[in-house]
């Protein structure tokens, strides 16, 4: 066993007590450049092994910054690659704890080849076993690619640095003005999923592993709960502007684990459990509340480029690991800016494809506006949602009724003596005929109109019914969207 180091302490903080078993403790560096003096390198700067989290097998590696600054050399890379081989054989998650100075210069291309080997192992493991990375120190250059190949990335928020190019190497950037390697910057860029101190990271990794399946052939994790499935949610309608609150209300014991909370805040993604079963949640956000319950930020209920990519990536993960998906839909269109126009079509296409391609149980609850193609892209019935519910106050249709009235009754409105009253009258007629939940239900696009306070009850019943869902799809290697 390696000496007690910070690297080992980080492993022990994540795993169940006394469960860690080290593999490859005797491995040491094999210097491949005879022009540089060889140094002692216990475990070649990385501790590898296995243990359990709440009784579930996981494989862990932790880089030791006290040994050659935790740099990656040939044997260091081989140890991580071998750990992936074990994990793939056993169908168990891999957790990587990063604190690394980068490539080991004295091993030159041998170290570089080691990087490539790890990249390949991670790529093959993607969608087969969950991969989680926690950045505690430096994670620069090629290490940033490694962390981004994982499914979820945690980052220590005071000392850790994550970058492809260091801040002072960026054209026009002054590090004192913009620390592009900081946890805050990378979280807002969507590179990092969770930030916090080391204790928060350890607890977060444990919680996440406990909610996820061990591999793509295992059913979603099931946890014991005493929370009443028929529990009413009287505050649901008031909370829906910030779906993070609404999802907490739906969840067992009010636990919602939000993913990428600092990125594309107008789109909420994360995990809840209902009746102990893990469910991936995607929702449109109109407001973000602070700890005092005051509105901190407001958002238009539209699909944005970043929001679409965020949701697409999350839905793809859920589909890969057979995790059911719940959507809370409140979207009236697409972001309408010149900058957005450069990417919104592709981003929305990817989101649409992700929902349509996902063959896991899918439930959609329409909580507000649901207009046009943006609504269709948000897990609509036509895309394959198994069950669609709507609140009585929801609106479902081509567009906002006021705008529709102005287009459809343009001549009549122009000739009216009271334009505003005529627009309101025609808008009400259009809404009743084309945009009401009753109209959508009559056409089969909504399965039931439900009261907001009964949302948990209906969601629980829906996923229980859909538990054994199976779909037959055409044989293909993969899609190209």
Question: What are these model-derived regions, one by one?
Answer:
Residues 1-481:
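Ligand-binding clefts of soluble mixed alpha/beta catalytic domains
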